[in-house]
């Protein structure tokens, strides 16, 4: 039985894949009774790998890959891991695939985009039932996680992948997942695009590895080359959704994509548990009246989303505190998506906070701002980096969590200088105020 996304899945609800169960049973291969419960898994896989000679009739590399894929899926794709009929692709595809959380976000985004492309009244309608006449084309199918989520609100959905083995894996899993309206196509994405007449939404997750197998973060180094194909993509689809590396400079990506005109409509910076996972860029042609929708930036961290117009933020001035922070004030660190967006002036407009300095990326307030999108702390002490002052505020403190913002030392160097172990309930922020003075802020988490 497969639980719906969002349902709680306990450890015992992750059965080994059926192929693994059958292979272990047939060849009398025994696993530790605690297998699947944590740290023993890696060493046990190594043990199995070294026992290949004992099981000549077993495709041990495939067996090990299925177990490793299932292990990854338990954290990344729990709904899939709970389905024993799912089969897993090679390690690289598992590493690159989206998590359920980020794939689910793309489903919600696609449903909203459908409302404008097809005239559906609201996104909840597109989420609850298939939109007639709609077509999704995923030109970079991969393991098919994103496709399996996004396709749910489309009448037809086409998965395109150039690796035949991945097509076979996807075809099997889509049937297991009950996706009856999908078509799997083994083809080169560019050639398929040339033959395509029209789609409601084209989705791409370009490969971010160069010919040597190393990772790349430049949009024009990815495969397929979105920059080269951009005009044709816009001709063939109402809307195009592009997933890019979280390491990419989104400002540069927008400039490169807008070289053919004002086509970038939205940039989504998506984080999970405060770790930036991906960038999503939405491009589309101007409306029939020739008006281009203003570019919007959406910063997402788990269930929290901050949206703003790029032009709105561009004209804002960041508010900076008139005097250095003091004990009793509250300190705020924006979440990762907001940090990547760079919309620091916007934060001082929307929330009752002010920056320690324009380059500090830290904010303070007199009273607690409970809805600030990030981490919140209470400042318990402040000092300069005068040795006597530092000794005073660190008296009795043996370990602390350290962060540096607009400060000329790394965390490692500062920790060594302060002679503090890592961890504990104390948080230290080293920064520079508006007068150029270096400060050490001692905080506790709120």
Can you annotate each of these PLM segments?
Residues 1-446:
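SAM-dependent transferase fold signal centered on methyltransferase-like domains
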């Amino acid at each position: 039985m497969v639980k719906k996304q969002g349902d709680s899945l306990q450890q015992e609800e992750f059965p080994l894949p059926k192929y693994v169960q059958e292979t272990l049973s047939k060849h009398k291969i025994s696993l530790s009774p605690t297998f699947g419960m944590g740290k023993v898994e890696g060493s046990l896989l190594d043990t199995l790998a070294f026992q290949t000679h004992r099981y000549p009739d077993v495709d041990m590399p495939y067996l090990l890959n299925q177990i490793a894929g299932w292990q990854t899926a338990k954290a990344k794709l729990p709904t899939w891991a709970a389905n024993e009929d799912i089969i897993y692709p090679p390690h690289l595809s598992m590493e690159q695939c989206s998590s359920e959380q980020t794939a689910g976000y793309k489903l919600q985004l696609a449903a909203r985009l459908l409302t404008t492309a097809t005239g559906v009244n609201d996104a909840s309608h597109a989420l609850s039932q298939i939109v007639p006449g709609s077509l999704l084309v995923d030109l970079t199918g991969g393991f098919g996680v994103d496709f399996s989520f996004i396709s749910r609100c489309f009448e037809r959905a086409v998965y395109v992948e150039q690796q035949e083995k991945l097509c076979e894996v996807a075809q099997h899993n889509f049937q297991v997942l009950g996706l009856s309206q999908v078509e799997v196509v083994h083809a080169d994405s560019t050639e398929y695009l040339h033959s395509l007449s029209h789609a409601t939404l084209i989705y791409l997750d370009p490969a971010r590895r160069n010919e040597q197998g190393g990772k790349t973060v430049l949009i024009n180094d990815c495969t397929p080359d979105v920059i080269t194909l951009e005009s044709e993509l816009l001709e063939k689809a109402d809307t195009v959704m592009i997933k890019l590396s979280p390491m990419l400079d989104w400002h540069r990506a927008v400039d490169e994509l807008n070289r053919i005109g004002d086509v970038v409509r939205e940039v989504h910076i998506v984080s999970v548990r405060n770790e930036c996972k991906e960038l999503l860029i939405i491009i589309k042609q101007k409306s029939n009246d020739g008006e281009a929708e203003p570019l919007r930036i959406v910063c997402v961290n788990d269930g929290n989303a901050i949206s703003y117009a790029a032009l709105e933020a561009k004209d804002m001035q960041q508010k900076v505190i008139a005097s250095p922070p003091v004990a009793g004030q509250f300190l705020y660190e924006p979440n990762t998506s907001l940090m990547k967006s760079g919309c620091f002036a916007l934060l001082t407009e929307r929330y009752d906070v002010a920056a320690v300095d324009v380059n500090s990326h830290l904010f303070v307030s007199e009273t607690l701002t409970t809805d600030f999108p990030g981490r919140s702390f209470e400042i318990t002490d402040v000092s300069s980096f005068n040795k006597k002052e530092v000794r005073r505020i660190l008296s009795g403190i043996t370990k602390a969590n350290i962060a540096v913002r607009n400060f000329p030392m790394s965390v490692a160097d500062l920790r060594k200088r302060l002679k503090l172990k890592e961890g504990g309930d104390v948080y230290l922020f080293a920064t520079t105020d508006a007068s150029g003075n270096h400060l050490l802020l001692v905080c506790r988490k709120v």
